[in-house]
Design a protein with these regions (language model features):
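Residue-level detection of the helix-turn-helix DNA-binding "recognition helix"
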Residues: 12, 26, 37, 66
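Conserved hydrophobic/aromatic packing and binding residues within compact polymer-binding modules
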Residues: 7, 21-22, 32-35, 61
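Recognition helix of helix-turn-helix/homeodomain-like DNA-binding domains
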Residues: 27-41
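Short basic helix-loop element that most often maps to the first helix and adjoining turn
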Residues: 5-24
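DNA major-groove recognition helix of helix-turn-helix/homeodomain DNA-binding modules
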Residues: 45-60
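Short, charged recognition helix plus adjacent turn
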Residues: 62-73
Length: 73
């Protein structure tokens, strides 16, 4: 299941750059960049911190596309 995120859009809405967002949530600029590109899936804790920093829910910030052939148990 691919994980999609809207971090870049929400970060831009707040007017903060990757460095500032990283500082707000305690990670590097490179980590923020990797998350935005989809190269890194954040931990639950980091996802919660990012959502709080962006003033949105985790569900608004991160979404996954469900594979219709894959059962969720």
């Amino acid at each position: 299941m691919p994980l999609y995120n809207h971090l870049k859009e929400h970060r831009a809405r707040l007017g903060v750059n990757q460095q500032e967002m990283g500082r707000l949530v305690g990670v590097s600029r490179q980590t923020i960049s990797q998350i935005e590109r989809g190269d890194y899936s954040p931990s639950v804790t980091l996802a919660l911190k990012l959502a709080k920093a962006c003033q949105v829910t985790v569900e608004t910030l991160f979404q996954y596309e469900e594979d219709n052939h894959e059962a969720i148990s």
